[in-house]
Curated annotation (Swiss-Prot):
Source species of the chain: Petunia hybrida
UniProt topology in membrane: Multi-pass membrane protein
One Gene Ontology term from the biological process aspect of the record: response to symbiotic fungus
Record flagged with keyword Protein biosynthesis: no
Signal peptide: none
Residue ranges occupied by any ABC transporter domain in the UniProt entry: 25-274
InterPro entries: AAA+_ATPase, ABC2_TM, ABC_transporter-like_ATP-bd, ABC_transporter-like_CS, ABCG_transporters, P-loop_NTPase
Residues in coiled coil: none
Enzyme Commission code: 7.6.2.-
Designated name of the protein: ABC transporter G family member STR2
Family: Belongs to the ABC transporter superfamily. ABCG family. Stunted arbuscule (STR) subfamily.
């Protein structure tokens, strides 16, 4: 919707009001190539280029549900990622209503709903959608946001679960179907024009799956271009699909209305058995050809040119049982080991071409088609001159009426969507319009507004999961009492001084280890961050600052409780406020370090391993076992980067910067505090102890900056 001044207005999705739309998403010559390691007949490993997607051209109409289907390993999710801009090396052109898709354009106009519903378990359905509205809808009134959320809850059929927690393995919450609908609601609250869904019915029962697709169908009718991948949809779900794109081995097998699949099969000379789904029958036929000597190239040529593929023999047509068909990728190497290359990684088995696909019985008479479609598994040399880049090859492919007349799957006659041939004949000039200037700001809220919204959400999550904070507090309280009773009344000798040094180093280690439980908590939250920021929901900087500010008061409480317990019980000397600040800075720098490590590792097991390994190193080089002056020159740098060095030395300086006697040596000489520091090569100057605080603060800032850099530049849902 545009106002009179040309600016784009607020687009509200009302899925209860069907509207006819034209236009949509177009794509041409989409190709995605990866380098695979393969083993030749001599057992040697070779690098080979393999196309996971190969020259796919088509469209997804606006106001319709476009379903991407195909056998297992057909490239459905890869194709969806390519359309959604999640593959950086994709070649070809993708455009929406004639406007080329750029990363910035995709983030502002689309939403991508993953298979895994990454949501905060301790927020209710209403709160989850309201926070999404806060972050997506910008500075509109809270009343309008609440009305939008209430309307969306009703439209998604979530009224009965409005005040129910999302839940997880440990907390009972909404059902799987309701959870999936909440995920959809989070991403459509701002009315995206493009909606991508990866297997939205995965893991759901038939009733829940139908409910989800029914809501998605209503969203499409409200004006969005909806593209989803789906595997073996039920007959009820098939009635809700408006447009099909069927793939096999990364090539286009069929495109058009589901109602025209039987016509497509009839033109191939195949009849759909009575009572059987035409879509499932087509997928069975695809698998039969894939297992035959002809391969799926024959069907790809038929989809492109209408050239009827040769019929299969009776023994070849019996390869695939009636649907639902199992994945034919499993165990193929056993039957065809002498004719196939052996992959090092079977995950990409679907991308390799059958070496029967170039059989002389078909390719000799259709060499022109194979030249258009083709590639072979042993293709080591590629002509890159004909490969397109999403950003640079805008005019290499042009839709014409002849192209659409030649496609043997008519869609405009039987599809319920309002389609027009001219909707898919977008000239190259259309991509050069000035429509980009009407996309609006990159983010809906200011930096400060985002930070405040994220802080409120963090506080709610902490308040409803108090065990994380309370567990740390209980540990520090119990350990404080134990330390106070164990090290009370130290003796006035060398052993008493050693005991006091042991108390300080154990305190530092205790505070370091108490932050380790942040590893799984953040790793779980990181997936939500990646989902939310992939489409400009908020800035990585605001997320970093909000997380820091949220934990500051909780860290202060932990430090204060421990400090009060041990300070008075052990009659420690020096300013109490300095003792408290050192403990607080130690917690802050350690927490920042643990959060940074958690942002780098892929899972909490490696996270724990990394944190424990660094803890051991920092402990070894902190100066307790060997002071910095006695360390080998090539290891001194470890003393400087150890986050245990500075709180340990700061606590010692606060305790021993005095001429007071702390013990008597074996020769009967007095041991003063300054003498203890001198023996440890620690400064006896009073003002120097504040440098330790500044250094700890600097390390906390450095680790937070590194944390931000990882989030900003390396935490992206994108393939190379």
């Amino acid at each position: 919707m545009r106002h009179a001044n040309g600016r784009r207005g607020d687009t509200t999705i009302d899925i209860g009001k069907p509207v006819n739309f034209t236009g949509g998403l177009e794509f041409s010559n989409l190709t995605y190539t990866v380098i695979k390691k393969i083993k030749d007949s001599d057992g040697k490993w070779l690098n080979q280029e393999v196309d996971l997607l190969h020259q796919i051209t088509g469209y997804a109409p606006k106001g319709c549900v476009t379903a991407v289907m195909g056998p297992s390993g057909a490239g459905k999710s890869t194709f969806l990622d390519g359309l959604a801009g999640r593959i950086s090396s994709l070649r070809g052109r993708v455009s929406v209503d004639g406007m080329d898709m750029t990363p910035s354009f995709i983030k502002r106009t689309s939403a991508y709903i993953m298979q895994d519903d990454r949501l905060f378990p301790m927020l209710t359905v209403y709160e989850t959608l309201l926070f999404a509205a806060d972050l997506r809808l910008g500075p509109i009134s809270m009343t309008d946001k609440r009305q939008r959320v209430e309307k969306l809850i009703e439209q998604l059929g979530l009224s009965s679960a409005r005040n129910t927690y999302i839940g997880d393995e440990g907390t009972r919450g909404v059902s799987g179907g309701e959870r999936r609908r909440v995920s959809i609601g989070v991403d459509i609250i701002h009315g995206p024009s493009l909606l991508f869904l990866d297997e939205p019915t995965s893991g759901l029962d038939s009733t829940s799956a139908h409910s989800v697709i029914d809501k998605v169908h209503a969203i499409a009718r409200a004006g969005s271009t909806v593209i989803l991948t789906i595997h073996q949809p039920s007959s009820r779900i098939q009635l809700l699909l408006d447009h099909l794109i069927i793939l096999a081995r990364g090539q286009l097998m069929y495109q058009g209305s589901p109602k025209d699949v039987s016509l497509h099969l009839g033109r191939m000379g195949r009849k759909v058995p009575k009572g059987e789904s035409s879509i499932e029958n087509l997928i069975d036929v695809i698998q039969e050809y894939d297992q035959s000597e002809l391969g799926v190239e024959a069907l790809a040529a038929f989809a492109l040119t209408g050239m009827k593929p040769p019929p299969l023999g009776a023994h070849e047509m019996s390869i695939v049982p009636p649907s639902p068909a199992p994945s034919h990728r499993e165990g193929r190497g056993h039957d065809r080991s002498n004719k196939r290359l052996h992959l090092k990684d079977q995950d990409f088995d679907h991308s390799l071409r059958s070496n029967w696909n170039t059989s002389k019985s078909w390719s000799a008479s259709h060499s022109g088609v194979l030249q258009t479609l083709g590639f072979s598994p042993a293709r080591h040399h590629r002509d890159h001159r004909n490969q397109n880049s999403v950003s640079s090859s805008l005019g290499d492919y042009a839709y014409t009426s002849e192209n659409f007349r030649s496609i043997p799957t008519p869609h405009t006659q039987s599809s319920e969507c309002t389609l027009n041939e001219n909707d898919f004949m977008t000239p190259y000039a259309a991509a050069n319009t000035n429509a980009y200037q009407y996309l609006g700001p990159k983010f809906a809220n200011s930096f400060l507004s985002e930070t405040w919204i994220l802080m409120r959400r963090n506080f709610i999550n902490i308040r409803r999961t108090p065990e994380l904070f309370l567990s740390r507090l209980v540990v520090l309280t119990v350990m404080g009492i134990m330390m106070a009773t164990m090290f009370m009344h130290p003796k006035k000798n060398l052993q008493g001084i050693t005991n006091r040094l042991s108390f300080f180093i154990f305190t530092v280690c205790l505070f370091f280890f108490s932050s380790n439980d942040a590893v799984p908590a953040f790793i779980q939250e990181r997936f939500i961050f990646v989902r939310e920021t992939s489409h400009n929901k908020y800035r990585a900087s605001s997320y970093t600052i909000a997380g820091l500010i949220t934990y500051l008061p909780f860290l202060a409480v932990q430090a204060a409780v421990y400090a009060v317990i041990v300070w008075f019980a052990l009659s420690l000397r020096g300013p109490f406020i300095y003792f408290l600040i050192v403990l607080y800075m130690s917690l802050l720098s350690t927490n920042s370090f643990v959060v940074f490590v958690s942002s780098v590792v892929p899972n909490y097991i490696l996270g724990y391993a990394a944190v424990i390994a660094f803890t051991a190193l920092f402990f070894l080089f902190c100066g307790y076992f060997l002071n910095s002056h006695d360390m080998p020159q090539y290891w001194k740098w470890m003393n400087y980067i150890s986050t245990m060095t500075y709180p340990y030395e700061g606590l010692l300086m606060n305790q021993f910067q005095t001429s007071q006697t702390f013990g008597i040596d074996p020769l009967g000489r007095s041991i003063t505090g300054n003498g203890i520091l001198k023996s440890l090569n620690i400064s006896q100057v009073e003002s120097k102890k504040w440098e330790k605080v500044y250094i700890m603060l600097a390390w906390a800032i450095v680790y937070r900056i590194l944390f931000y850099i990882v989030l900003r530049f390396f935490s992206k849902n994108q393939r190379t």
